[in-house]
Design a protein with these regions (language model features):
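N-terminal secretory signal peptides that target proteins for export/translocation
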Residues: 1-7
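Solvent-exposed, charged/polar functional surfaces in cytosolic regulatory/catalytic domains
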Residues: 49-52, 56, 141-145, 184
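Acidic/histidine-rich alpha-helical segments that form the ligand environment
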Residues: 111-157, 169-177
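Surface-exposed helix-capping loop/turn segments at secondary-structure junctions
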Residues: 56-63, 144-155, 191-196
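Sec/Tat signal peptide C-region and signal peptidase I cleavage site
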Residues: 23-28
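Bacterial N-terminal signal peptides
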Residues: 10-22
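Short, contiguous alpha-helical
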Residues: 40-44, 48-51, 63-115, 157-202
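Short, low-complexity N-terminal intrinsically disordered segments enriched in polar/charged residues
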Residues: 29-40
């Protein structure tokens, strides 16, 4: 057999093996418990990554904003924290008093130290220590809510007003939102002369 024939056979064998492994892997159905575990793992990773950002920004730059018409660094992160809790509350049907931008009952029978009103506009929450507290707490609450939701209910439809989707979709939207706003702050950190944290993909 010629060298080229051997090479072709080896290539065919490799492709067949890869296809077989792919088919075998794709045949493994993921369970609701596995999805929940992945949600928790990703939220824990996201918390660590966001804390990297918060720690990287100098305390005296938390009020920095690239242009006057947008949120400061502190406000971006406080908005992230507020919506971490809000969207996950929607996902699990936890009692919500009103739409974001107005007053929200953060306590709801729990001992959560949130200021009244919309968090990012709280004058007492803008310092580095306060922002880190609220952001860190928001991730803990999100993880708590996810752990408390039976994966068998992921397909149920829920929402607020006319905005309806599955619980699973709301959980995805909550994660997407915090990723978006953390990403927006990358340029804030660069503009004050600090190197942003490296990605935490795993």
């Amino acid at each position: 057999m010629s060298h080229s024939s051997v090479k072709k056979l080896a290539t065919y064998f490799a492709l067949a093996t890869f296809t077989g492994l792919t088919c075998s892997a794709s045949a493994q159905a993921i369970t609701g418990d596995q999805i929940e575990a992945q949600f928790v793992k990703d939220w824990q990773r996201a918390k660590a990554y966001t804390l990297d950002y918060l720690n990287a920004m100098p305390a005296d730059k938390y009020s920095f904003r690239p242009v006057d018409s947008i949120r400061s660094f502190a406000q971006q992160m406080l908005h992230l924290a507020w919506v971490n809790v809000f969207l996950n509350m929607v996902a699990i049907d936890k009692k919500i008093d009103s739409f974001p931008g107005q007053k929200l009952n953060w306590h709801d029978g729990e001992k959560i130290d949130w200021p009244d009103g919309y968090l990012e506009n709280s004058s007492t929450a803008q310092g580095k220590d306060s922002v880190i507290y609220y952001v860190s707490k928001s991730y803990d609450i999100a993880i708590q809510y996810i752990k408390g939701l039976d994966p068998g209910r992921y397909g149920e439809i829920t929402g607020m007003g006319n905005i309806r989707d599955t619980r699973y979709a709301w959980l995805l939207k909550a994660f997407e939102h915090q990723t978006h706003h953390r990403g927006q702050t990358t340029i804030y950190i660069r503009l004050v002369g600090v190197k942003p944290p490296n990605e935490r993909l795993f």
